[in-house]
Curated annotation (Swiss-Prot):
Coiled coil residues, start to end: none
Lineage top rank: taxon: Viruses
The protein's name in its UniProt record: Minor capsid protein L2
Motif mapping: Nuclear localization signal: 1-10, 511-519
PTM comment, free text: Highly phosphorylated.
Disulfide links within the chain: 19-25
Compartment annotation: Virion; Host nucleus; Host early endosome; Host Golgi apparatus
GO terms, biological process: microtubule-dependent intracellular transport of viral material towards nucleus; symbiont entry into host cell; viral penetration into host nucleus
Gene Ontology CC annotation, any one: host cell endosome
GO molecular function: DNA binding; structural molecule activity
Keyword Protein biosynthesis among record annotations: no
Lineage of origin: Viruses, Monodnaviria, Shotokuvirae, Cossaviricota, Papovaviricetes
């Protein structure tokens, strides 16, 4: 007798909802839902007598009780204490506005002055530097009468020592005069700082020191080797080593951090490499069997719904139980290849409540490099003087010998055609296989060379009187020297397996054996 299959009942929550109103609920379901079991009563009676809330145990707020959390090794916090302020050892400087320097007003305008400015013709001023007169009064050194300087000598046996007093040098006075002319058309800066370079504003001229005149004495500054600044038209382009693939390289640390917490995390996401090229264009065909829809774009996130009763294995085993397949993401591998990735979500386990549980899967495919083909070695066809020549085949034109006097097509007509009318070309031209050649400044010549389709080899020469062609001869002979055997040698040579002899024996020289037939 077959044993009946045990049917598992529904959860206690669902049974309690339906049987509570009817009053047919089992006791275990009521105790479990209403929390009246023995374990629940022990917790209720025990919590009424013992209170552990101040110790921060179980479901407290985490504030540490009434006293709060106190770090180990430190005293309590003083309430109302004042922090000690340490004065700085250095007195800071007073910050305030700088001294105001009075500015003199140049050419003040009186209230009674007319506001109308008369127009005058300004003569062209010479901006070139002219002769600057420099007046220097140099006073000569006054003459000083010579005086006898006493010389002290000693008579001891030591070395003689001469004590010479230095001559006093009188101070010299040098005076330099300067003359300045006022020009209302320009504003001149008469004082400048001894800096290298010159800067000017619009409608201003800066006159720096040292531009003219004579310098007496040393300049007092050392010459420093200066570097010339390149103009805006001169520039150099340096190739980076190694060549970069982007104008703004990404930091390696940031890229490694993103890669570690992204799709390549093997602890959280399963890594699956896809070899099928359909993954790049139509990844949905790897998950389920379906018809192609050209209006549907595969660049969006796809959701696949599948009933458990009608389970069908996907075309690719790696895409089993995949419910969600994300949009493509492009990245670069450490080896420099382009990677196309899609993040998928599996739905492997399904509970009775309808929740589905599954792992995340990273489907990726690395694109291979496009190898450059080897260059094709081109052969030199010939050298010419520059004149163009076109060689046409025999299919482009046809020559037919026609007698103009005889017209077999016009025999049935009474009207005789004029000989000039026969010169008109009424045929329809077909330019489907033609080539249009547009010449340049040089003259072009067209030559028609017939082409015969024959098995024999032949050479054709094009007559050209305008240019010079260099022809490279080629060996077109196909005949080979035929070696005929000597008449005294046999025509047929038979190789035998006999290794004892050092010659080949002709079959005609062998001894013939008569065949004996036995008759019954």
């Amino acid at each position: 007798m077959a044993r009946a299959r045990r049917t598992k009942r529904d959860s206690a929550t669902n049974i309690y909802r339906t049987c509570k109103q009817a009053g047919t609920c089992p006791p275990d379901v009521i105790n479990k839902v209403e929390q009246t079991t023995i374990a629940d009563k022990i917790l209720q009676y025990g919590s009424a007598g013992v209170f552990f809330g101040g110790l921060g145990i179980s479901t407290g707020k985490g504030t540490g009780g009434a006293t709060g959390y106190v770090p180990l090794g430190e005293g309590p916090v003083r309430v109302g204490g004042t922090a000690t302020v340490i004065r700085p050892s250095l007195v800071p400087d007073t910050i305030g506005p700088s001294d105001i320097i009075p500015v003199d007003t140049l050419n003040p305008v009186e209230p009674t002055t007319s506001s109308i400015v008369p127009l005058t013709e300004a003569s062209g001023s010479d901006l070139l530097p002219g002769e600057v007169e420099t007046i220097a009064e140099v006073h000569p050194t006054p003459s000083i009468p010579s005086t006898d300087t006493p010389v002290t000598t000693t008579s001891s046996g030591a070395s003689a020592v001469l004590e010479v007093a230095p001559e006093p040098v009188p101070p010299s006075r040098v005076r330099v005069t300067r003359t300045q002319y006022h020009n209302p058309s320009f504003q001149i800066l008469t004082e400048s700082t001894p800096t290298q370079g010159e800067s000017s504003l619009a409608d201003h001229i800066l006159v720096t020191s040292g531009s003219g005149g004579q310098t007496i004495g040393s300049s007092g500054s050392d010459l420093i080797e200066l570097q010339e600044f390149p103009t805006r038209y001169s520039f150099e382009i340096e190739e980076p080593t190694p060549p970069r693939q982007s104008s703004t390289p990404i930091q390696r640390l940031r890229t490694a951090f993103r890669r570690r917490g992204g799709l390549t995390n093997r602890r959280l996401v399963q890594q699956v490499a896809v070899d099928d090229p359909i993954f790049l264009t139509q990844p949905s065909r790897l998950v389920s069997f379906q018809f192609d829809n050209p209006a549907f774009e595969e660049e969006v996130t796809q959701i696949f719904e599948q009933d458990l009763d009608n389970f069908r294995e996907p075309p690719n085993r790696d895409f089993l139980d995949v419910q969600t397949l994300g949009r493509p993401q492009y990245s670069e591998t450490p080896s420099g290849y382009i990677r196309v990735s899609r993040l998928g979500q599996r739905r492997t386990i399904r509970t009775r409540s309808g929740a589905q549980i599954g792992s995340q899967v990273h489907f990726y495919r690395d694109l291979s490099t496009i190898d450059s083909e080897d260059p094709i070695e081109l052969q030199l066809l010939g050298q010419h003087s520059g004149d163009a020549s076109i060689v046409q085949g025999n299919t482009e034109s046809t020559f037919i010998n026609i007698n103009i006097d005889e017209n077999p097509l016009a025999e049935d007509y009474s009207i005789t055609a004029n000989s000039e009318d026969l010169l008109l070309d009424e045929a329809q031209e077909d330019f489907s296989g033609s080539q249009l050649v547009v010449g340049g400044r040089r003259s072009t010549s067209t030559y028609t060379v017939p082409q015969f389709e024959t098995t024999r080899s032949g050479s054709y020469y094009t007559q050209d009187t305008k240019g010079y062609y260099v022809a490279y001869p080629e060996d077109r002979s196909t005949s080979k020297d035929i070696i005929y055997p000597m008449p005294d040698l046999p025509v047929v040579i038979i190789h035998t397996y006999d290794t004892s002899g050092d010659f080949y024996l002709h079959p005609s020289l062998r001894k013939r054996f008569k065949r004996k037939r036995k008759y019954l």
